[in-house]
């Protein structure tokens, strides 16, 4: 493996780890007695983010840095085909046909390849957590950033995050921002 290939793989591995952390922050495991619903929703979200990451590696697919954002993630996650017998056909197609080493298909299959009632339960958990990304202010705030977290802690820095206490649904945004510093 060349030095360039090794560096590329290292960056991909780092991005995958960060995407997993983001999925964990958006859909934390709160039900310790039966974490399967939250874990499935978390894996589905992580799988979609990995699909977007894979697409960003191929310029022909058009997944640019500007398009790789929470708004588009929420749009993909909530997309349903009009066919009541196959509401996830487009998502299945989007996630299928990937490289044989891709984790995407195995991560999303629990949600999209299950009985309709089971799928609805997973999606119920997910939709309650990602509904925040339908908020115009959140879409704007998360669609770009001029902060570089890679060198953020190289010198003394103060970060102020203003999140209203009464808007608990926005707390995960602050959590994700802070976790990126570590």
Where are these regions (language model features)?
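P-loop NTPase motor domains
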Residues: 1-182
